[in-house]
């Protein structure tokens, strides 16, 4: 329920000292007074109406301004201050004196749209702590509505309702609302992508949350990797401990894949190609990260490339896509990015894994930069890395776990050998496991390298969303306090 504005009129009482006599001149004066009061009334009513309108307009301007002021009173550091030295805000202060604030991040990926609602607390003079996350996902991805933009709004509104239910009413106008689109929209023609973003922005503007001009955007791949790196290192406590040993991040999405880590060797910095290094400022510290996103090498896009298809285009004349990575007896359909392809296996002249590995190597040839330092950095991997490993029993499906890179190759050989004679319900498993095995080796990981695969840390999703909302809040801080 929206708060209304109550206007009350006030009356001033005038005291007139009159002569006790009641002669003819007093009677005439009363008539003049009555006549004058009518004229005053005719002027007073329009004047009062104008004053009322002025007060209302002033109130609306004040109300809008306080939305931004309320947010910064909770999150903005004073010039030169560290996180935790923010101005006190009664709106965002818990009973124990810790400041409380929220952030909403929409992840518009290639296979679905997800909302993350984060609640943070900040003890005095310390970095923030994540105290709660609400997560909900809807399918298909936003890019599926490229030719019917109006339909995209329904899912966005449904996810906004999740945020409204999770965030107390008094915090709505102070809570930043952001949507970042990833590979799904990056692969769309520019005009179609912009129409989708404009529709989402219109829905956001109608919401009660704090919405900036940059609230909706397509996230570039580098930022996606950086944000995921922030998430992992925040959840593992590294960012709270100056000088702590950071961990690297591997994310395998549907349309793109990212790698990010903090180099410790000068040679890594010098050998990195242009565009692979980025400076990140968080919690008043600056990090120089190795971060890169490979568009088209996400698991679903890689499948299409291995099959010989072209992104966003149906096969010519409905032609069947034949692949050495599928069971020789398999025939079926596969849908990707709203396009349905007819696919089939082919008779194998050698082992299925051997032929598939050769095809995958062709797709990956000269597309991935290899760096030696990854051998010596602890890495977390998630998204499709996790799903594939859990699907073949390499890790616990609920808890995650650790494995060595070579485990993917062992699993790939086993699954491919099984598919040669026993087609099963996962026709792409040989292809996917072979692809992941070779992709990791192309990055420079030896078969003996241990990776930690996790879906959640402290019950929080290990996606880029948390890091992105932190980065967004930090950028708002710097806009308001350039000296900080």
Tell where the protein language model's regions lie, with residue ranges.
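Helical "lid/coupling" subdomains associated with nucleotide-phosphate turnover
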Residues: 2-11, 15-38, 103, 117, ...
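Membrane-interface recognition of transmembrane alpha-helix starts
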Residues: 35-48
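Hydrophobic membrane-insertion alpha-helices, especially the h-region
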Residues: 45-57
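N-terminal low-complexity, Pro/Thr/Ser-rich intrinsically disordered segments
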Residues: 76-97
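A short acidic Gly-Thr/Ser loop motif
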Residues: 98, 106-114, 250-256
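Beta-strand initiation motifs
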Residues: 124-133, 211, 268
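Interhelical loop segments of eukaryotic multi-pass membrane proteins
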Residues: 62-81, 127-131, 483-484
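Transmembrane-helix exit/juxtamembrane "anchor" motif
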Residues: 41, 55-68, 394-396
